[in-house]
């Protein structure tokens, strides 16, 4: 048997075949939590209260008057293309659920607890392996397709000041043992497998601060820590085919998926009129911490060993970005039913650098326009003892078209174009009790 040969994790011939493309952010960042927030482009740092605050600003879960439950559903049509053809990015659809329970402590103080949940319809998580040199939307392939869990707690003093903390919860995937035995015995194919994988929990901190410095002005600050699903898999294949090949192969994979950058955000809301509110948010995203491409190591101990060329993949070199969001809400109270009309817009610059090397990650600056309407069943006693909100939101995201050209004198590869649109519709209901 030949001595074991170590093939670098960055071996180009291997990386091109099975390297994992990481994804970014999460569904609630992409489409908002609740239809009211989605209709204002997610500009809710200063105005979110009750269940929707569990995601947009944890401090707001202590600002509600009554316990409340939010339930919603949304569908996002991913109309993206590469080289003028469908990029085959899966549509995103799932259920949002939120809870906020404020408890009066006396002396003007209120303690609140809450949670934000998102459950995709198709699966709890989607991990996809795409060759790094194959053009694909690295930030949109997976990120709308994972569960989100964000428990929070907050304390508020009247309607003047509130502070909230919590965590965004995810899990890693780490193998303790993955072994496959394959071979041929007496002319019959045989095989068996042993699998032992653990999913240790990871937490990213959530912090929110809210204040009302003026009766018509509200302001908020938020911080969320970096989060990712880290994959550490070691797969051992024992091969026994007498007279043909015997030995074993160890494949070791290290990768990150669902990368969500650390972010710091601030927002302000001004009640221009008692029935008209303008909202603005600004968010700094630390994309420069985006992890490197998948780290793959292969140890071969077979009677045959194909030669491979060792090389290195470049670091992603993502850049930090600043997102801006604007929202407006007009409320018209009625005798028994209140109506709210909302609109918003956002600008999300891409963190992906020019793809002139081995990798071919498609992306583009994004323009987001939103609109929606809400109805509050405010005074329907004795049928309803508490108000119920019913909201609808429509979103259009335009991913700017880009033409990417390679430096073919140093790195082989073809030019490609990318771009498209994302259309999203969502509904939600908030019930107080």
Q: What residues fall within each predicted segment?
A:
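Surface-exposed strand-loop-strand hairpins of Gram-negative outer-membrane beta-barrel proteins
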Residues: 42-47, 77-92, 410, 414
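Outer-membrane beta-barrel pore proteins
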Residues: 45-47, 54-67, 101-107
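Residue-level detector of alpha-helical secondary structure
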Residues: 39, 53-60, 70, 98, ...
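Outer-membrane beta-barrel porins/channels
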Residues: 26-38, 94-433
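Bacterial N-terminal signal peptides that target proteins for export
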Residues: 1-11
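Transmembrane beta-strand segments of Gram-negative outer membrane beta-barrel proteins
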Residues: 27-44, 62-77
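N-terminal signal peptide c-region/cleavage motif recognized by signal peptidases
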Residues: 19-22
